[in-house]
């Protein structure tokens, strides 16, 4: 750990009152998840004392407690306010409504990239019937309608009444598009009635991905195409000097935020089990160099707060993580898999 980091940890540990060396380290571990080595701890104390940011108190037995000086407390408060303002300017803490989030996500470079690959792989043709499983607010229904026009049809299905209403409003001038309220696990469609289908970041959220794929297989005609795009959240990497903190964040996303956090790596196997052939798997890695752009997709601050509440990250470590990410330079990456499946006769 860098000396400046060690000094700031010592200042934070002393914020609530005087402590001696062992107790300082215990307080540091409680808020950051780590202890300082003896050299780092006592070196930090010596430097802080030289800067008149801490001062020793009268020894109690063999223990020598330290406390913050007024200058040390002022510095600690100034740093905390400064970094909180910085991370607050970069990251959004409020949870956006689902429609706004999906609309915002669709405009990102990452989404445009993989959606283009999915559309090419689906190869929807004029006159075909195309199914969008979990269509959301209708983001991709217009594109599908254009691909199957003039005589084809597009069916969007979603389990959310709000999403269905949004999708219907957005496609009311597209007569080829139908939007239905339905459960991906029990589709309201006849066997073999669909030529091609897609599912876009939906299977990561459903209760039973295997059942959803079995239903997709049922409604597709023999030879029909299913294209799926799903992230593998265990592939999420975020550059941070303390690797354990970034790993803990990724574990929390995979374990708690996303129901099926590693669905991306499972898609090909699940499709084969459901009776599909799987001719193509395309990995697409989205790289983020801008913290605000990454926050649109990853929800860094709100999910960090959840990680603290769930016990995956200590509070101080999480704030330092957000401060570091906000200050930059920033790097994050996550891999999404586009899997092309074909219904076997």
UniProtKB/Swiss-Prot annotation:
InterPro entries in the record: Methyltranfer_dom (IPR025714), Methyltransf_Superfamily (IPR050508), SAM-dependent_MTases_sf (IPR029063), Tscrpt_reg_PadR_N (IPR005149), WH-like_DNA-bd_sf (IPR036388), WH_DNA-bd_sf (IPR036390)
Alphabetic keyword roster: Methyltransferase, Transferase, Transposable element
Record's signal peptide: none
Keyword Transferase part of the UniProt annotation: yes
Paired cysteines (S-S): none
Pfam families, per database record: Methyltransf_31 (PF13847), PadR (PF03551)
GO molecular function: methyltransferase activity
Gene Ontology terms: biological process: methylation
PANTHER family from the UniProt entry: METHYLTRANSFERASE
Family designation: Belongs to the methyltransferase superfamily.
Name by which UniProt lists this protein: Uncharacterized 37.1 kDa protein in transposon TN4556
């Amino acid at each position: 750990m860098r000396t400046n980091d060690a000094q700031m940890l010592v200042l934070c540990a002393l914020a609530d009152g005087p402590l001696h060396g062992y107790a300082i380290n215990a307080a540091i571990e409680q808020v950051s998840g780590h202890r300082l080595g003896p050299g780092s701890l006592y070196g930090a104390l010596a430097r802080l004392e030289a800067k008149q940011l801490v001062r020793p108190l009268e020894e109690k037995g063999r223990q020598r407690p330290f406390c913050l000086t007024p200058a040390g407390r002022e510095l600690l408060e100034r740093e905390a306010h400064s970094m909180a303002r910085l991370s607050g300017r970069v990251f959004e803490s409020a949870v956006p409504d689902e429609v706004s989030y999906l609309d915002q996500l669709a405009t990102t470079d990452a989404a445009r990239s993989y959606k283009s690959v999915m559309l090419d792989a689906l190869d929807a043709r004029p006159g075909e019937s195309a199914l969008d499983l979990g269509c959301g607010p209708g983001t991709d229904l217009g594109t599908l309608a254009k691909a199957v026009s003039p005589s084809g049809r597009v069916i969007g299905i979603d389990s959310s009444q709000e999403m269905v209403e949004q999708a219907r409003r957005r496609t009311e001038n597209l007569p080829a598009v139908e939007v239905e309220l339905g459960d991906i696990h029990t589709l309201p469609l006849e066997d073999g009635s669909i030529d091609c289908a897609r599912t876009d970041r939906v299977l990561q959220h459903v209760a039973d991905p295997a059942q959803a794929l079995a239903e997709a297989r049922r409604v597709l005609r023999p030879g029909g195409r299913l294209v799926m795009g799903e992230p593998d959240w265990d592939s999420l990497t975020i550059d941070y000097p303390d690797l354990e903190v970034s790993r803990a964040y990724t574990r929390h996303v995979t374990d708690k935020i996303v129901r099926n956090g590693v669905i991306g790596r499972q898609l090909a196997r699940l499709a084969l089990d459901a009776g599909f052939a799987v001719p193509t798997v395309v990995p697409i890695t989205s790289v983020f160099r801008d913290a605000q752009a990454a926050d649109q997709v990853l929800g860094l601050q709100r999910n960090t707060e959840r990680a603290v509440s769930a016990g995956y990250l200590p509070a101080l470590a999480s704030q330092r993580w957000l401060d570091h990410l906000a200050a930059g330079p920033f790097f994050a990456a996550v891999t999404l898999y586009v899997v092309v499946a074909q219904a076997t006769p």
